[in-house]
Amino acid sequence: MKSWSVNKIIMLISLFLLEVIDSQIISNNIINNFNTKQNSNNIKMTYGRFLEYLDMGWIKKVDFYDNGRIAIIEASSPELGDRLQKIRVEIPVGDSPLIVKLRTAKVDFTAHSTINSKGIFTQLSNIFIPLIIIIGLIFLFRRSTNFMSGPGQLMSFRKARAKVQTEINTDVVFDDVAGIDEVKEEFEEVVTFLRKPQRFLSVGAKIPKGVILIGPPGTGKTLLAKAIAGEAGVPFISISGSEFVEMFVGIGASRVRDLFKTAQQNAPCIVFIDEIDAVGRQRGAGIGGGNDEREQTLNQILTEMDGFKENTGIIVIAATNRVDVLDGALLRPGRFDRQVSINLPDIKGRLEILKVHAKNKKLDSNISLGLIAQRTPGFSGADLANLLNESAILTARRNKFAITMSEVNTAIDRLLAGLEGTSLTDTKNKRLIAYHEIGHAVIGTLLKYHDEVQKVTLIPRGQARGLTWFIPNDEQALISRGQLVARIIGTLGGRAAEEVVFGSSEITTGASNDLQQITNLTRQMVTRLGMSTVGPISLDANVEQVFIGRGIKNNNEFSASVANKIDDQVKIIIKHCYDQAVNIIKQNRFLIDQLVNTLIQEETISGNDFREQINNYTKLPKKLSTLSEKNNVNPKITESFVVF
């Protein structure tokens, strides 16, 4: 259909609609005139009185409206002052003898035709609804015609929405990526291959076709991929896994073909697929079966990666934090040959990351990046960047010219615990919370296996009314049973302090999160870590998450008697730890009372001040922070609170 003919059709439809609207306006004027006549006669008369007037000969003229249901009469009577007036009368339906009576009395009467407004709206709706549908279809047809006939519009919809950075310099190099030195060394040979491929080809080596980066969010997977392209000086083509599949069937596979076609045109280059688990999940499993469109896209990715010509100079890098759900064919040699894990940085890595992000920040001379790195275990690179940014924002809000440790500490507290709330004014609740937090801090300080106290505060943050911060002396990949038990005892210190000081009837709900944490930790000690009398066995090794393509439900592979024994061991461990916490609170009651008074007065006590006050009353134990120190400990002392 040509565009000019469509315009003519729309013009004719518009003229028809104008005609209908014009007729509707005329009809409305007639109805309004009729209503005006009705409203002009304020005198009303009953039908019985009307018949009496008719018998008396006082009716001069009658006008019928609304299909004979309403009559406007002209009458003159002594009641009306012998003046001719118009009166409204409602006529009963089906009173045909009235016409005979009017003719007998020789009264002039006229029936006026009226227009039913409801009928008009019904007719208009019958006309407008089909017209609206027709106009909508014409509009959609024109859009589809333009889409099909436009230059390259249909083909562009099937093209991959990848970002192609063809400049040799990506503005990101390995120096901008800190905290993952081992991973950077792993990619040095990838960069060397892209720069000097003949070194590998001369000895018959084949560079891996694909490398998949595995790690938690914010650890620098995308940044590392850009740095590889920047170091190698090759184009960088990036796309997200969610951009392949859309509402139309076959679009995902088409975009995959277009992506690799673009890569071949820009070879040597790097293709980066972020969040590949969006299209790379295991096929045909899980609840509801597979997703045909997603699986078709995955099959095309497998075909393209396996169909490369040898040594074309195209390296595919993918990133995911859910490698457990990826299809096995995607991870086999010849596709993603290597899996590189990018873990959360250790204290040395965090320090290097802080140095990178602090380059454009104005820091005070007394600020310590090493202390910040020590206070932020578990922070990713993105978290550390956000930390310094929040510190800078807080510095500007306070009208300062440089970031100090005060802003950094406040930003850490905000990121970990939430916004700062209003301090408590209720003396009883404030004292109860103070005993709860001091209970955590005192036990954590007096246990040699426990981490050191960093800060105790009564300032609310988030959902917490009070907080006790602990900071590890170092980061270990291996945690001893003594450390786990010390954590359980310290976590139960708040509840133990409440019971010892206020009695069992005054314990509160403040320990609900503590109880949840120690229950989960204790159950892991029994079922996963083999740290109980159940024995050195793992009872949940085969448990997998549901709905991710592996299974539909979790099955316990042990008997009911073993389950009962697990529950008994969990109860025994927790009870033993709670008794230890209660004993420590009772033995140091005077010290705890003094610390509570100080905390209520100052609201916040730093770790150094806290340990100094405790040292005035009792000798502090030497913290055991390394395996060599732990190996020199008297085993009998260790056994006193580790074995159950």
From Swiss-Prot:
This is ATP-dependent zinc metalloprotease FtsH. Its cofactor is Zn(2+). In the central section; belongs to the AAA ATPase family. It is found in: Plastid, Chloroplast thylakoid membrane. It comes from Vaucheria litorea. Residues 27-119 are lumenal. It is an enzyme of class 3 (hydrolase). Homohexamer. It is a multi-pass membrane protein. InterPro entries: AAA+_ATPase, AAA_lid_3, ATPase_AAA_core, ATPase_AAA_CS, FtsH, P-loop_NTPase, Pept_M41_FtsH_extracell, Peptidase_M41. GO terms for molecular function: ATP binding; ATP hydrolysis activity; ATP-dependent peptidase activity; metalloendopeptidase activity; zinc ion binding. Zn(2+) binds at residues 436, 440, 514. Its EC number is 3.4.24.-. Residues 1-5, 141-644 are stromal. GO terms for biological process: protein catabolic process; proteolysis. ATP binds at residues 215-222. Binds 1 zinc ion per subunit. Its main location: plastid. The active site is at residue 437. One of its GO terms (cellular component) is chloroplast thylakoid membrane. Pfam families: AAA (PF00004), AAA_lid_3 (PF17862), FtsH_ext (PF06480), Peptidase_M41 (PF01434). HAMAP family: FtsH. The chain crosses the membrane at residues 6-26, 120-140. Acts as a processive, ATP-dependent zinc metallopeptidase. CDD domains: RecA-like_FtsH (cd19501).
